[in-house]
Swiss-Prot record:
Its EC number is 4.2.1.20. It is an enzyme of class 4 (lyase). The active site is at E48 (proton acceptor), D59 (proton acceptor). This is Tryptophan synthase alpha chain. GO terms for molecular function: tryptophan synthase activity. NCBIfam families: trpA. Pathway: Amino-acid biosynthesis; L-tryptophan biosynthesis; L-tryptophan from chorismate: step 5/5. The alpha subunit is responsible for the aldol cleavage of indoleglycerol phosphate to indole and glyceraldehyde 3-phosphate. Belongs to the TrpA family. It catalyses: (1S,2R)-1-C-(indol-3-yl)glycerol 3-phosphate + L-serine = D-glyceraldehyde 3-phosphate + L-tryptophan + H2O. CDD domains: Tryptophan_synthase_alpha (cd04724). Keywords: Amino-acid biosynthesis, Aromatic amino acid biosynthesis, Lyase, Tryptophan biosynthesis. InterPro entries: Aldolase_TIM, RibuloseP-bd_barrel, Trp_synthase_alpha_AS, Trp_synthase_suA.
């Protein structure tokens, strides 16, 4: 219900969803919690939280570096502890996890979804799992009332987009471009055709990700028919550039989010 409530409220105010991505435990668990608190206080719509992994193939150098920083002290137990703490801090904000398949399968699919539910997680997106393998997780997701998110990529066929639109719950992660994550100066591709196709199959909101780093990108995304954006690399870069000054880091995150959602 949290995603539904969020999108309904945004629609009422004619606003786009702004969802930040950060890696849990980057640069450490204490500061990671402060970063998430700052994001919530700054007015983000929902959270997309990454689980650190040693080979994050869908990510560019900025987010890869955040995985490596977090991996110095990361564990699944600590990740779940932090998620519980975040949910305890705010009961209403939707929390999504972005994970790589290996982490989930080595933990045990059903156990992972059960634990995610217990921590107050609303959705799971598996970055490197093709749609064809969806049956491996969908039953556990449904059993534990976790919304499974799928990715709509620029080179997907109409049939694939129909599958993505039909099976995605909460929202559809729509790629602004092929390749890996990373902040861009411009949105290279017009995703309006993909979004239009998705909306013929389902009313599930489409969020645009990959390369979102400026206010004008949100305006562009709105023009393409997107219901919101997911912004990762630009935020993670602020963390990377201010590792030695926590106060400055949190202030800059607050300023960045404020500029994006104003």
């Amino acid at each position: 219900m949290r995603y539904q409530n969020m999108f309904e409220t945004l629609k009422k105010h004619k606003k786009m969803a702004f969802i930040p991505f950060v890696t849990l435990g980057d640069p450490n668990y204490e500061l990671s919690f402060e970063i998430v608190k700052t994001l919530i206080i700054s007015g983000v719509s929902a959270l997309e939280l990454g689980l650190a992994f040693s080979d994050p193939v869908a990510d560019g150098t900025t987010i890869q570096a955040s995985h490596l920083r977090a991996l110095k002290h990361a564990s699944m137990a600590k990740n779940f502890q932090l998620l519980k703490k975040i949910r305890g801090y705010n009961h209403d904000i939707p929390i999504g996890l972005l994970a790589y398949a290996n982490l989930i399968f080595s933990y045990g699919v059903d156990g992972f979804y059960a634990q995610a539910k217990e921590c107050g997680v609303d959705s799971v997106l598996i970055a490197d799992m093709p749609l064809i393998e969806k049956e491996l997780v969908i039953k556990s997701a449904q059993k534990h009332q976790i919304k499974q998110i799928f990715i709509a990529s620029p080179n997907a066929s109409s049939k694939d987009l129909e599958q993505v639109a039909t099976h995605s719950q909460g929202y559809i992660y729509t790629l602004a471009r092929s390749g890996v994550t990373g902040a861009s100066h411009t949105l290279e591709n017009d995703a309006s055709a993909i979004i239009k196709t998705l909306k013929t199959f389902s009313s599930t909101p489409a969020l645009l990700g990959f390369g979102i780093s400026k206010k004008e990108h949100i305006t562009n995304a709105k023009g393409m028919g997107a219901d919101g954006v997911i912004c990762g690399s630009a935020l993670v870069k602020i963390i990377e550039e201010n590792l030695n000054n926590e106060d400055a880091m949190l202030e800059k995150i607050k300023g960045f989010v404020g500029g994006m959602i104003s």
